[in-house]
Amino acid sequence: MPTLLPRAAALTLAVLMPLLAGAQAVDLAGVKFEPQIMLGGQALQLNGAGIRYKAIFKVYAAGLYLASKASTTDAVLAAPGAKRIHVVLLRTIDANEFGKILSAGIQNNATREEFIAALPGIQRMGEASSQYKQLVAGDTLTVEWLPGTGTTLYVKGKSEVGPYKEPAFFNAMAKIWLGKSPADHLLKEALLGQAPRRQDN
């Protein structure tokens, strides 16, 4: 497919830019991800960032922030301290449909026990998504984990879900992008700070 190589190259650049640019922000399709942020009084660093594609279309840009670098899903989930997943839409999408896609992403990557543990947050996420008609380019979805506080989901900067004190909801949300059946395999590799492999199917 002719679109695969440019896409892989773009995502590889997304991974390498922090190394090449030092302390400069990573710019993906006009969305800037700062190399460091503060969350709950803790300094977090950009672990990786990339773009979610559907066919040739850019759907959203996403960045993962952790206290220290992690290159595997297990390491991300086990990492101590605060964590943030920040998503910025690059096109208009039906909010209710987006909520269903996220819920399906959780279900596709969670065990039955994990899904049940995260169910209160999943149900509230569905309720929250129904309050919005559309999400447009520039709108944000942010999932934050703060030890002692729990997981909170923000839509357009507004707290909509949580906080849930147990890590189950954050882990379930993280697996949408980092699980065995992620939303986008190349995006998963970018978030984990890995050079994306070219995909031929």
Where do the language-model regions lie?
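Cysteine/selenocysteine-centered motifs that mediate thiol-based redox chemistry or coordinate metal-sulfur cofactors
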Residues: 185-201
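N-terminal secretory signal peptides that target proteins for export/translocation
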Residues: 1-5
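N-terminal secretory signal peptides
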Residues: 24-79
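Mid-length scaffold segments of soluble, non-membrane domains
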Residues: 70-148
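Bacterial N-terminal signal peptides
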Residues: 10-19
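Flexible glycine-rich active-site/ligand-binding loops centered on an Asp-His dyad
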Residues: 162-187
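Short strand-turn-strand beta-turns centered on an Asx-Gly dipeptide
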Residues: 155-158
